[in-house]
Curated annotation (Swiss-Prot):
It catalyses: XMP + L-glutamine + ATP + H2O = GMP + L-glutamate + AMP + diphosphate + 2 H(+). GO terms for cellular component: cytosol. The lineage of its organism: Archaea, Methanobacteriati, Methanobacteriota, Stenosarchaea group, Methanomicrobia. Keywords: ATP-binding, Glutamine amidotransferase, GMP biosynthesis, Ligase, Nucleotide-binding, Purine biosynthesis. It comes from Methanocella arvoryzae (strain DSM 22066 / NBRC 105507 / MRE50). This is GMP synthase [glutamine-hydrolyzing] subunit A.
């Protein structure tokens, strides 16, 4: 089976390197790239999918709002999830609970990305900022008692966002979420 090429868009989050390593451990040709890259820079590398990492603030998201509209399968993690929501017309707000902590997640829709993970799971997440309103054409996938929009997907495009960090060991079934995203990329290839 051919290796897929996945680019991890570096939003300067403290676990960005773990996303890169997790994808490599799953047999992917993964590469970290700057969030200041241009759309042309990304497309020249012919990736099969993009993963947007977490990061400290929207102000450090570089060219992310343009990159997240590239026509490829995309997984947004934490800040990447928020960036996706903002770029497609959703709303972001400061969360009531900053810092990393255990969060109990209720899976609302077990779609391609969350297949085999629900109906409940435990994750590691930060809610310094969070998605407050879904963008048009997106559907809710998961929620918690801390945040109403823990995960989302586009209705027709392979765009997925999760508030939590599947790349860290504290997240149950985080590897499965990444494997599910890889399968989405493989089916689209």
């Amino acid at each position: 089976m051919d290796k897929l090429k996945l680019l991890v868009i570096n939003n300067y989050g403290q676990t960005c390197h773990l996303i890169h390593r997790s994808l490599r451990d799953l047999g992917m040709d993964a590469k970290l790239v700057s969030n200041t890259s241009t759309v042309e820079d990304i497309l020249k590398q012919s990736p099969d999918g993009l993963v947007f990492s977490g990061g400290p603030t929207m102000e450090r998201a570089g060219n992310g709002e343009n990159l997240i509209k590239i026509d490829l399968p995309i997984l947004g993690i934490c800040l990447g999830h928020q960036l996706m929501a903002k770029a497609y017309g959703g709303e972001i707000r400061t969360g009531q609970y900053g810092g990393f902590a255990r969060v109990d997640i209720d899976i609302v829709e077990e779609d391609d990305i969350l297949r085999g993970i629900g109906p409940k799971t435990v994750v590691w997440a930060s809610h310094q900022d969070e998605v407050a309103k879904l963008p048009p054409d997106f559907v809710l996938l998961a929620k918690s008692n801390i945040c109403d929009i823990e995960a989302m997907r586009h209705k027709t495009k392979p765009l997925f966002g999760v508030q939590w960090h599947p790349e860290v060991s504290h997240t149950e079934k985080g590897t499965l979420l990444l494997q599910n995203f890889i399968e989405v990329c493989r089916q689209r290839k």
